[in-house]
Amino acid sequence: MRPQDAPFRPHWWATGMSELGVEARPDVGTYGRYEFADLPPVPFALDGDLSWLEPLPSQEEWPITGNAATEFGALLAACGRTGTPLPAAFAKFMADEALQGKVRSSTGCFIDLDRAPVRVEGGGCFVRFLADQQGCLFWYLYVTEDGADHAVVCSPEYFDSEEHDVAGDLGEVSFSAESFEAFLCRYWLENEIWFASVGDGEMPDVGAEYLERYREPDGA
């Protein structure tokens, strides 16, 4: 889904990068809400198969592995009942704990998979899949009403299928990525850049180029 086609304003919730020379990412606390238009492109071809993720090493500390092993089956069943299609990359990732263990979070986020979609006021549905450890932010798949497209959105609001028949209060929901794979790729890369900056791991080969492009005023 393109940002201009989404019913939510585009922003990228993440940590600051001012110490790495990215003026567009001032440090404003654990998370800042940054301009989506300033983001550089992700440095891999995204074909829906997560081929860029598969060769990466597993992480012993701070992996985002959470409850997918126990909840993904229930989510699949619920989506089958409601006719809600899940993106191929999302299904592959949530079904494979080894893939989940390759992605880590500098803020302690973890997979917090809902057991069913939540209908969205105005059309479509949310599927929660990632949560900040302190409950500051939550990330959701947004699947359109006809199921033909999806995006990733982020909100400080907690939408859960056992608590909400319909997700309202959408004013704080931000469009965060054109697809689940695009979100996962950027999330992985930016967290690895952070860990490398504090001496906990090597800078990814594509990390320096990503930062250089981000430092340019137009984000190109």
Language model segments and positions:
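Intrinsically disordered, low-complexity segments enriched in small residues
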Residues: 1-8, 185-188, 194-202
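A short secondary-structure junction signal
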Residues: 138-143, 164-165, 195-196
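A surface-exposed partner-binding patch
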Residues: 1-148, 157-159, 217-218
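Intrinsic-disorder-associated interaction segments
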Residues: 6, 46, 65-68, 169, ...
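Short, flexible coil/linker elements and helix-boundary hinge sites characteristic
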Residues: 21, 80, 192, 199-201, ...
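Compact, glycine/acidic-enriched structural inserts
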Residues: 150-194
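Charge-dense, low-complexity intrinsically disordered regions
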Residues: 12, 199-220
